[in-house]
Amino acid sequence: MASVDGDSRHLLSEVEHEVSPGPMNIQFDSSDLRSKRPFYIEPTNIVNVNDVIQRVSDHAAAMNKRIHYYSRLTTPADKALIAPDHVVPAPEECYVYSPLGSAYKLKSYTEGYGKNTSLVTIFMIWNTMMGTSILSIPWGIKQAGFTTGMCVIVLMGLLTLYCCYRVVKSRSTISTSDTSTWEYPDVCKHYFGSFGQWSSLLFSLVSLIGAMIVYWVLMSNFLFNTGKFIFNFIHHINDTDTVLSTNNSNPVICPNAGSGGRPDNSSMIFYNNNTEVQLFEKWWDKSRTVPFYLIGLLLPLLNFKSPSFFSKFNILGTVSVLYLIFVVTLKAVRLGFHLEFHWFVPTEFFVPEIRAQFPQLMGVLTLAFFIHNCIITLLKNNKNQENNVRDLCIAYMLVTLTYLYIGILVFASFPSPPLPKDCIEQNFLDNFPSSDILSFIARIFLLFQMMTVYPLLGYLARVQLLGHIFGDIYPSIFHVLILNLVIVGAGVTMACFYPNIGGIIRYSGAACGLAFVFIYPSLIYIISLHQEERLTWPKLVFHVIIIILGLANLIAQFFM
């Protein structure tokens, strides 16, 4: 075996000194070298931020083979046969491989486990939680009642925050193993064995596939309304004449009035004597045709081996949420507030403040506040680890305020009379006609953003399912195609027969939240306290109540 001095030779030829570290330099903890696994990179693919070409020596290639030899001796989680220090390259010689085929230089640091400031960490958590659920918050408030809805949002925010805090602290309860590289499924496996690992995988897939189904329903909705806007604009058709709506310069519609809550796609029934309109209605239907048009566009994107290209558009999610906040604020200013308070008895135009359907809002909020399966990963990159709990609390507070802001403004400004509050749709954008310019822009933003996120969700589902079953995230094009056809088929089926995003969100939220939000964090905490002989009756009762609440939340969704 080569000596330590011999192995300390430079693996890469001398390179031009970097004036600025640049945004692509990835930081890591220099004390954690034993967990690094370098990759052999083709010489033409070794790049720096300033594109200085570097060469890989034969010595580096040989060392790479040694590393792979050690990695085959045992499982990655087992530290017993990890590669010794003299085989692992020095910090300045470590590179991380990008799926795009490039290697980016790692920069050592000593300030923390990551490079993100608290402000960046807070924004990342907020941005990750801001999803499609925000479109259903006003509908959830309508189902619960205005006062009850606000209280439920605050209480669910506090409850999910506490459970998320328990997830963050779960690794520190394990003293027998090095948990620095663990994710939450690893913690579940430690406490519950293979059942914990596979059940966490199952519920994670439920949340992923549920989100993909909601995305397909919404993309069908947005594509339908976009096409309808263009057709109506060309043919000078006013679609507010065919539905119950307000007669002013800021029209609000009740598209499902008299349909028992079922989606109504015949929005131009008064123009059926026009052959052109009849043809358009036949081939441009929200439930019968548009969901199938998306297949030709999105199915090929799901089969990409790497979704790296689509990750470049993540900023669109933030832009979409900020634009929604702007639209809601502007609409509220123009429409004004329309509120009456009746505690238990509904009226013609207003719902009572307390309604028995409040569990529907709880189901929506379980998914709206759901970040428990990836919060450990997000906080690992925080520069100051001692601020993790504080940053998590601030992020949850901002998310709660965002949901309250959107929900209260949409509900309060909904024009009642002449329209009843029960007209608030599961996607509140459906309460604005397709001819509304602000809503049209919002739908375009959201449609494009969802079309870039959808392949990322499909990739995550592929990694979790095929990676666990076959040990390879891309075993063959046949395996990947079958999985994608099943996922797309589920989305098309729901878009055709159950295009109710509020219902889909609350069911999937209550299901995945049962494990990740309510049961696992509480049960792991109870077990750890029992092992340390610190378990008390108040703590036991409190966390058992949380588990029971999660079960009740799921069961209640089937009776609403």
UniProtKB/Swiss-Prot annotation:
BP GO terms, sorted: amino acid transmembrane transport; asparagine transport; cellular response to amino acid stimulus; glutamine transport; L-arginine transmembrane transport; positive regulation of TOR signaling; positive regulation of TORC1 signaling
Phosphoserine sites (modified residues): 20
GO molecular function, one term: L-asparagine transmembrane transporter activity
Region of interest called Important for arginine binding and amino acid transport, as start-end residue ranges on this chain: 128-133
Topology of this chain in the membrane: Multi-pass membrane protein
Sequence ranges on the Lumenal membrane side: 140-145, 225-282, 334-355, 415-436, 500-506
Ranges spanned by the short sequence motif CRAC motif, renumbered to the chain: 456-462
Major subcellular site: membrane
Taxonomy, superkingdom: Eukaryota
Family under the similarity heading: Belongs to the amino acid/polyamine transporter 2 family. SLC38A9 subfamily.
Name of the protein described by the UniProt record: Neutral amino acid transporter 9
Organism for this UniProt entry: Mus musculus
UniProt gene name: Slc38a9
